[in-house]
């Protein structure tokens, strides 16, 4: 779906996150303080792009909304966008022919110790563009606490109850990111881009002190965690318009991740382990496109190779060496037949996996069909079907065994196989200049996915792992409406629906239905912008766990003055005891009910100050067509 932001929306925004918030995109939540975009429906991650390039927080904060031409919102992305991606937001901007842009963006919470800031610069001369950004972020909190009730059915049939309640916590983290990019563009005929990025993060000396009621015993236990990691990334991209109808695109990304973690927990008895993790990956893709009449044909090849070495030392002793190789070839034809727009594609993927003495080969046929019919002006009916493979997270395929508490263990399963997902989406939409509406039905069928599996040992220890089981299905139905009550001045948007989960394990069946709603209102009053947003969170059931991610509400007021913008936001209003999450495990031998509170996120007031100075003329930017990324360190926790 293509979206063209209005002048009022551009003028009232100061970065990429801000303009996305003004658009009120269905199923997306914008976090002001953490500068993050998440999917409310819990279907997967949200991938952000600028001119086709996968971007992070730094690029989104440096983006000038006045340069935005259009936004492509993809709610059913294919496998080429990456694993676990539920939504893609691609922001297309103009680029300066000459001149520069410099700026800064600072956000701080006035009620908690949390904030981030960045500086950035961009210089253009002729066909070349250089950009550099640097950012820091961090937080320190003692407000996050959880309460847990666990009931264990022992081998003799008796029940054993343990309560675990936090009485004191400290969570803190610090991060730094830097990125240098060079882009050479000969109009839109040839594009070359090279970027080098690096990130550092530390979460030192975090701890939780818990009050333990273990049968007749009452004592306190302490958990401590210390994490640090760094990761350089090199990204090379090339695009060539061979002829007016033919183009060639290539992308290669090399990533290295180094992670060191240390964990300690003394519930029952002391348990301590360290992990030294190293990951190296290469992701490549080549696409050829030929725009014929009356259709366009594209073919491509995607190859990835990843090596992971995680050395577990201490009480969790294990050395895992994992090699993942994946090859995916695909072809697609798209065009128009009268009022019918179509895209027909097929592909095949091959996965080769080894870990120590474990290995497998896996083939998948991957068809995709997309049809859209214009019934009348503004009224459209569309349908999409696709099949793809789904590979388990590297961490859960590790052969490491880690103790969770005095009664529970988490064990990886190196024999997990990929699953096959089939997705159907049917949508009826109607749009005018002031009204945008649609009704959407989405059904996903996961064949032999990895699902939660718990078993009790003879000495009454409870082991959690994952194995390939029967099936998981999900049905998501919603209706959306956005309307300009006063054009360019006052806009409202609402959406809501139901989410139905079906879990068919080898020895359990769990069904669950939840309802959701989202609403927003935005007023553009000259240099002032006022916005309110609310949702009721996300409720779901996966495997044997029923979960809830907290609701969110926020009021924001912003003021623009020349090259400056000042914003004040109040999140989770009148909720001083904010429930961040809730989880209920419904295994036949193990019942657990956990509630997590984050008082710092309730009644949270934050301020944002941004400054941007731009000089130079603009032209249409060449768009980066493919993107690759890797952030998985493969450590089990």
Where are each of the predicted segments found?
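Outer membrane beta-barrel strand-and-loop segments of large Gram-negative receptors
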Residues: 281-283, 328, 413, 417, ...
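C-terminal low-complexity, acidic/polar tails when present
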Residues: 197, 251-255, 261-265, 272-278, ...
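Face-selective signature of the C-terminal outer-membrane beta-barrel domain
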Residues: 175-203, 224-367, 374-378, 435-443, ...
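Outer/extracellular conduits and scaffolds centered on Gram-negative outer-membrane beta-barrels
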Residues: 469-486, 499-503, 511-524, 531-553, ...
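Outer-membrane beta-barrel translocator domains and adjoining extracellular loop/strand segments
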Residues: 143-157, 204-215, 219, 234, ...
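Membrane-proximal, glycine/serine-rich, low-complexity loop/turn segments characteristic
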Residues: 1-208, 223-254, 289-295, 370-374, ...
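Extracytoplasmic loops and strand-loop junctions of Gram-negative outer membrane beta-barrel proteins
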Residues: 73-74, 100-104, 158-166, 214-222, ...
